[in-house]
């Protein structure tokens, strides 16, 4: 994990990531989206880049450091889902393979807002599975919140919310 993370920090930002970082910086400077700057992406993209800059400063590697942190968290959720679906070896194998696959995909995949949305969706799916297994309103509420966070990066992923609700009603 450490080697993959360090290698990921050396990848240059993609052109999209340069633009998103600039917009995140503008947010930190007090500019207002859609008035002071405009892009076709939703505000979650800029907000996460602003958070990366706030945490790691204005550096070429700031977004990759923050993205790899998000990726590491989502990898834990995915490993547990793999364990539930296919056993403990699947969970352990995913933790070994995921960083190599993610970093090896290069900057046109890793760190893109599609992948960030996917990281939120993996966590949402984990909470959804827990909601189906256990009682309480916290589990589905967390799943819905994470789907909302994913939608702020990639709005089309919102189709999953009604599908997961239908699946819960079916059980």
Residue ranges and their predicted role:
Residues 1-17:
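Transmembrane signal-anchor helices characteristic of membrane glycosylation enzymes that use polyprenol
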Residues 109-117:
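Short acidic/glycine- and proline-prone juxtamembrane loop motifs at membrane-interface regions
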Residues 83, 124-142, 168-170:
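Membrane-interface transmembrane helices that cradle and orient dolichyl/undecaprenyl
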Residues 1, 92-103, 122, 126, ...:
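Short helix- or helix-capping micro-motifs
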Residues 43, 47, 57-76:
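Loop-to-helix entry region of an early transmembrane alpha helix in multi-pass inner-membrane enzymes
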Residues 75-102, 118-119, 135-138:
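Transmembrane-helix signature of polytopic, membrane-embedded enzymes
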Residues 138-155, 160-167:
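Membrane-interface alpha helices of multi-pass inner-membrane proteins
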Residues 18-38, 43-51, 55:
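Extracytosolic helix-loop segments that constitute the early lumenal/periplasmic catalytic or substrate-binding loops
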């Amino acid at each position: 994990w450490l080697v993959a993370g360090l290698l990921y920090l050396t990848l240059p930002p993609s052109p999209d990531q340069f633009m998103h970082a600039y917009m995140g910086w503008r947010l930190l400077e007090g500019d207002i989206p859609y008035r002071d700057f405009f892009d076709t992406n939703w505000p979650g993209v800029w907000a996460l880049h602003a958070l990366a800059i706030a945490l790691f400063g204005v550096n070429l590697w700031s977004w990759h450091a923050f993205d790899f942190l998000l990726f590491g968290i989502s990898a834990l959720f995915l490993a547990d889902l793999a364990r539930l679906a296919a056993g403990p070896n699947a969970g352990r194998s995913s933790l070994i393979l995921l960083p190599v696959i993610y970093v090896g995909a290069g900057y046109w995949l890793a760190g893109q807002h599609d992948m960030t949305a996917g990281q939120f969706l993996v966590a949402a799916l984990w909470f959804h599975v827990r909601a189906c297994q256990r009682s309480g309103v916290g589990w589905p509420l967390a799943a819905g919140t994470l789907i909302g966070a994913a939608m702020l990066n990639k709005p089309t992923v919102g189709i999953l919310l009604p599908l997961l609700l239908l699946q819960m009603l079916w059980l």
